[in-house]
Curated annotation (Swiss-Prot):
It is a peripheral membrane protein. It comes from the Eukaryota. The gene is EXPA10. This is Expansin-A10. SMART domains: DPBB_1.
Amino acid sequence: MAPCLLLVLFLLPALATGHQHPSTLGSSALSEWRSAKASYYAADPEDAIGGACGFGDLGKHGYGMATVGLSTALFERGAACGGCYEVKCVDDLKYCLPGTSIVVTATNFCAPNFGLPADAGGVCNPPNHHFLLPIQSFEKIALWKAGVMPIQYRRVNCLRDGGVRFAVAGRSFFLTVLISNVGGAGDVRSVKIKGTESGWLSMGRNWGQIWHINSDFRGQPLSFELTSSDGKTLTNYNVVPKEWDFGKTYTGKQFLL
């Protein structure tokens, strides 16, 4: 495997699969095919929970092995988190598995290694478009002996099981919300929140898909307005009930495809 540093570790459940997983199967293309490269790491299902997108337990959130760490040029400082990509191996008759592709969700960051040139080992250095895959996903499109493999990728819609999930955390005047299981484009680009004692207020991106606001919403039902990268907006009214508590997760409506 070519040198590439992950910001944090993935959790990769043993029962997860590749593009057949119903919660990550892309339904339609959102972009044209583009060229990139991919490599893999030897994933252990018992690895610690982590990920630069804030999803934590990837099995719990429905992503499983069908995940990817994106290079700087693609990660967009976390804005790309949750987006789905269809990936296929190209230009290598020896190692590619013909006619195959996978759909993966962006859940992590492949950090650059500035000690190596971008074209000689620093695979995730700018301006490279690079996908770091768990070996279980990589082997669905190419033989592991390929190492660093030329690929093509495109953005696709994400199909998710159930609705968008809102995991509430924080304390008193500081509220954070992890937004996961987002269908459609998958990557939330802006979030607004509304209690019964306020109008719509913009939340800031804390990191990945964790959003925050400095306000006290205790004792109020909460509504959220999400806008994804394709410009679609989803409003979940009172998805978090009045009796909500920190540490709980609430499920709302889903983006329509």
